[in-house]
Swiss-Prot record:
Cross-referenced InterPro entries: DnaJ (IPR012724), DnaJ_C (IPR002939), DnaJ_domain (IPR001623), DnaJ_domain_CS (IPR018253), HSP40/DnaJ_pept-bd (IPR008971), HSP_DnaJ_Cys-rich_dom (IPR001305), HSP_DnaJ_Cys-rich_dom_sf (IPR036410), J_dom_sf (IPR036869)
Key words, A-Z: Chaperone, Cytoplasm, DNA replication, Metal-binding, Repeat, Stress response, Zinc, Zinc-finger
Record lineage: Bacteria, Pseudomonadati, Pseudomonadota, Gammaproteobacteria, Enterobacterales
Organism this protein belongs to: Buchnera aphidicola subsp. Acyrthosiphon pisum (strain Tuc7)
UniProt key word NAD: no
Gene coding for it: dnaJ
UniProt cofactor(s): Zn(2+)
Name of the protein in question: Chaperone protein DnaJ
GO CC annotation terms, alphabetical: cytoplasm
Zinc finger (CR-type) boundaries: 132-210
Length: 377
């Protein structure tokens, strides 16, 4: 029976781009997937047909061959076809790939491939980063099939030796004066074929699922730090080792504190009376409030260090410090009495010409005067 056109199977024009091919495949694969149509042989056949069409059209070389020769490019027994040596699952990037690499190196039977590593982005608060915490996360992943235990075969059966390569995982092809060694197109280098696949995973040995993990965040982590959980990534194909899971940390912005390394910074407003006369204030830390002594004549922007109130180093457990930057606040919403008092205070400063009370201002304006005097000379 004549095979249906691959473009018609996916419902796309022959001029379709890669994006259109992927979109059409995703839509049809979800509709006819065996997990959604259990026991429906028609849907199962349709799914295989869709998958075959996608694998050909998404590959540039295979698509080019199909456009030139049609289904004959992938069928055995066509002596006039360039591709007659290979079965439907042939990979043309293998056939026309690094020929000399195959001559001198040669492919070997494929080993079971380790599962892919996964990455999970986790947001935590500054308090959680400083003190450490345990969190549960749920991740989508491929896990080893519990029915076949990753073998991909139905219960009570085993994979059989590939008849094309006789279990070697590789075949030899004549290329003029050379014999080229290639990965077997039937078993894809495995050396075995699953003739009776598992009903649950359909021979893949893995199933899509979600799993919940408890992740311990040690004290001291910062944004862009990563935690590695061994063997918690995707399950490997054909029973191979699982990949790893990397938890990428992002620390949320805090309303009071900023972090630089193991030190914490915060701004503390004080009124100009305390700045001038000194006093004692309470400042926040991540462990509660502590008292901070403000000396007289404190200038705005001065840093005060409170030792041991920062972040513990994740490497050596040394504790950072808290640095408080005081900001002298200009009073607002003054009543008449307060304004009169400030005028009186200001007049007293003027009487001293600011030399004693505002030495910084005096230095600045003296510098400005010298600057303009030099310009007029």
């Amino acid at each position: 029976m004549a095979k249906k056109d691959y473009y018609q199977i996916l419902g796309i024009p022959k001029s379709a781009e890669e994006r259109e091919i992927k979109k059409a495949y995703k839509k049809l694969a979800m509709k006819y997937h065996p997990d959604r149509n259990q026991g429906d042989k028609t849907a199962e056949g349709k799914f295989k047909e869709i998958k075959e069409a996608y694998e050909i059209l998404i590959n540039e070389e295979k698509r080019s061959a199909y456009d030139q020769y049609g289904h004959a490019a992938f069928e055995n027994g066509q002596s006039n076809s360039t591709y007659s040596t290979f079965t439907n699952s042939a990979d043309f990037s293998d056939i026309f790939g690094d020929v000399f690499g195959d001559i001198f190196g040669g492919n070997r039977t494929q080993r079971a491939k380790k599962g892919a590593d996964l990455c999970y982005n986790m947001e935590i608060t500054l308090e959680e980063a400083v003190k450490g915490i345990k969190k549960e996360i749920q991740i989508p992943t491929l896990q080893k099939c519990k029915t076949c235990y990753g073998s991909g075969t139905r219960t009570g059966t085993k994979p059989r030796s590939c008849s094309t390569c006789h279990g070697k995982g590789q075949i030899h092809i004549r290329k003029g004066f050379f014999t080229v060694q290639q990965s077997c197109p039937t078993c894809h280098g495995k050396g075995t074929i699953i003739a009776d696949p598992c009903n649950l995973c359909h021979g893949q040995g893995r199933v899509e699922t979600y799993k919940i993990l408890s992740v311990k965040i040690p004290p001291g982590l910062d944004t862009n730090d990563r935690i590695r959980l061994n063997n918690e990534g995707e399950a490997g194909a054909n029973g191979a080792q699982s990949g790893d899971l990397y938890v990428q940390i992002t620390v949320k912005k805090h309303p009071i504190f900023e972090r630089e390394g193991n030190n914490l910074y915060c701004e503390v407003p004080i009124n100009f009376t305390m700045a001038a006369l000194g006093g004692e204030i309470e400042v926040p830390t991540l462990d509660g409030r502590v008292k901070l002594k403000i000396p007289y004549e404190t200038q705005s922007g001065k840093l005060f260090r409170i030792r041991g109130r920062g972040v513990k180093s994740v490497q050596n457990r040394n504790q950072g410090d808290l640095l408080c930057r005081v900001v002298v606040e200009t009073p607002v919403n003054l009543n008449e009495q307060q304004k009169n008092l400030l005028h009186e205070l200001g007049n007293s400063f003027h009487g001293f010409r600011g030399e004693k009370n505002s030495p910084r201002s005096k230095r600045f304006f003296d510098g400005v005067k010298r600057f303009f005097d030099d310009l007029t000379r």
